[in-house]
């Protein structure tokens, strides 16, 4: 029988062992990123999801949940100092609300955590007119966008109604799927970021991309933008190229019903200046590129002179992307690629379209009214300028999108 002192030693040993395990688990997640702010985002999301996993899920959200936040300040002198800043702050806005939204959008918190923390987010060369920067999670399922403090305030203004709308439509919407909003502070640099589901696919590459507002004034991509590998083209580019979206009557009806409902909701909130983001996947082009890629890999393996074969390490993030059963070219999982629509059988090319509403946080306030007056003077009252009131904006937007679907 163990003596009291032996029992105490045993308990102490057990506690020590537990602490050691906890320390090792922390070291596995190094949150390596070239930008310290990204390292802090990875750390913060990991910390937040771990904390939320211990909180009981409430039956319903309370008004205070829409004002709540959690924040933590870290003075990090010893642990993982090669990868993490010495001092940083992380703040999460409305954690219970965003957890509920993730659930309603069919996103598991563990999967969300893995996507944002297992490997560093990847920079995206898209840049909004506001100067916002974008990253995608390493598995391309989520988009991380820098936003302004005004955007954070507007998000708080609409969050309760947005959440209610998502509840009523059962998460079936073309609106951005807001999944988390954070403030990061490193060495005196403070940024705000919002995480949304990626409109585009994690596996079907997009070769053409458009940002459409239904306006024709100053709605053409710049020469600098067009020089990019995947430029963001605009309304006049779409019209001048004779581009069309070829979807069948059934998909068209479903899409336009969702779009109309979403846009009416935005008009009620006095929101405007949003866009329809359109991405086009060319099935035959993707197949051809895959064949060429495989041929090149075969040549490289043949020239490697018995060196280690080229491949993905067993524990690398790359292996998580294709854990689901393989899909045929142009096929997709509608639970993951929620914005994807196939072209109809008579389309000139076999394509898959990804379409969703983006950038919904612009409120029609005094500034927008002034901009509208100035542009009306410059371009004339009949010009299709983008700064019109929310009702006009929504009507013109719906008319334009209705005409490009065929």
Curated annotation (Swiss-Prot):
> Where can this protein be found?
Cell membrane; Nucleus; Lysosome; Cytoplasm
Query: Is-annotated flag, keyword Glycosyltransferase?
Result: no
**Mind listing the UniProt keywords for this protein, alphabetically?**
Acetylation, ATP-binding, Cell membrane, Cell projection, Cytoplasm, Kinase, Lipid metabolism, Lysosome, Membrane, Nucleotide-binding, Nucleus, Phosphoprotein, Transferase
Pfam families associated with the record: PIP5K (PF01504)
Which SUPFAM superfamilies does this entry report, sorted A to Z?
A: SAICAR synthase-like
> What is the name listed in the Swiss-Prot or TrEMBL entry for this protein?
Phosphatidylinositol 5-phosphate 4-kinase type-2 alpha
Q: Does the keyword Amino-acid biosynthesis apply?
A: no
Instruction: Please report the organism this UniProt entry assigns to the protein.
Output: Rattus norvegicus
Superkingdom of the organism of origin: Eukaryota
What does UniProt say on post-translational modification here?
A: Phosphorylated in tyrosines. Phosphorylation is induced by light and increases kinase activity.
Q: Which reaction does it catalyse?
A: a 1,2-diacyl-sn-glycero-3-phospho-(1D-myo-inositol-5-phosphate) + ATP = a 1,2-diacyl-sn-glycero-3-phospho-(1D-myo-inositol-4,5-bisphosphate) + ADP + H(+); 1,2-dihexadecanoyl-sn-glycero-3-phospho-(1D-myo-inositol-5-phosphate) + ATP = 1,2-dihexadecanoyl-sn-glycero-3-phospho-(1D-myo-inositol-4,5-bisphosphate) + ADP + H(+); 1,2-dihexadecanoyl-sn-glycero-3-phospho-(1D-myo-inositol-5-phosphate) + GTP = 1,2-dihexadecanoyl-sn-glycero-3-phospho-(1D-myo-inositol-4,5-bisphosphate) + GDP + H(+)
Give the main localization category: membrane
Compositional bias ranges of the Acidic residues kind? 289-304
Q: What class of enzyme is it?
A: transferase
């Amino acid at each position: 029988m163990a003596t009291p002192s032996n029992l105490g030693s045993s308990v102490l040993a057990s506690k020590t062992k537990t602490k050691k395990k906890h320390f090792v688990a922390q070291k596995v997640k190094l949150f390596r990123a070239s930008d310290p702010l990204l390292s802090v985002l990875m750390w913060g999301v990991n910390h937040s999801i771990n904390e939320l996993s211990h909180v009981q899920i409430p039956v319903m959200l309370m008004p205070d949940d829409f004002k709540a936040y959690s924040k933590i300040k870290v003075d990090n002198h010893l642990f993982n100092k090669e990868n993490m800043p010495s001092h940083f702050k992380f703040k999460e806005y409305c954690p219970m609300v965003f957890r509920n939204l993730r659930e309603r959008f069919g996103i598991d918190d563990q999967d969300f955590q893995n996507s944002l923390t297992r490997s560093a987010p990847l920079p995206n060369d898209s840049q909004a007119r506001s100067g916002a920067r974008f990253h995608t999670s390493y598995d391309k399922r989520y988009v991380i966008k820098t936003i302004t403090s005004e955007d954070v305030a507007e998000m708080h203004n609409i969050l309760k109604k947005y959440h209610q709308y998502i509840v009523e439509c059962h998460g079936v919407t073309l609106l951005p799927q807001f999944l988390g909003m954070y403030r990061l502070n490193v060495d005196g640099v403070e940024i705000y970021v919002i995480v949304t589901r990626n409109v585009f696919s994690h596996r079907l590459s997009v070769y053409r991309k458009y940002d459409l507002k239904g306006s024709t004034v100053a709605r053409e991509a710049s020469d600098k933008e067009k020089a990019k590998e995947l430029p963001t083209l605009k309304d006049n580019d779409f019209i001048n190229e004779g581009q069309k979206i070829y979807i069948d009557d059934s998909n068209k009806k479903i899409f336009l019903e969702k779009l109309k409902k979403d846009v009416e909701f935005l008009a009620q909130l006095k929101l405007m200046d949003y866009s329809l983001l359109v991405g086009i996947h060319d099935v035959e082009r993707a197949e051809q590129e895959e064949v060429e890629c495989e041929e090149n890999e075969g040549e490289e393996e043949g020239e490697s002179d018995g060196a280690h074969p080229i491949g993905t390490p067993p524990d690398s993030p790359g292996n998580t992307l294709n854990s689901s059963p393989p899909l045929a070219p142009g096929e997709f999982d509608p639970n993951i690629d929620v914005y994807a629509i196939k072209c109809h059988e008579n389309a000139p090319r076999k394509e898959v379209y990804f379409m969703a509403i983006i950038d919904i946080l612009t409120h029609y306030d005094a500034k927008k009214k002034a901009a509208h007056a100035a542009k009306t003077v410059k371009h004339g009252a009949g010009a299709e300028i983008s700064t019109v009131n929310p009702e006009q904006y929504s009507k013109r937007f719906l008319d334009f999108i209705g005409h490009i679907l065929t």
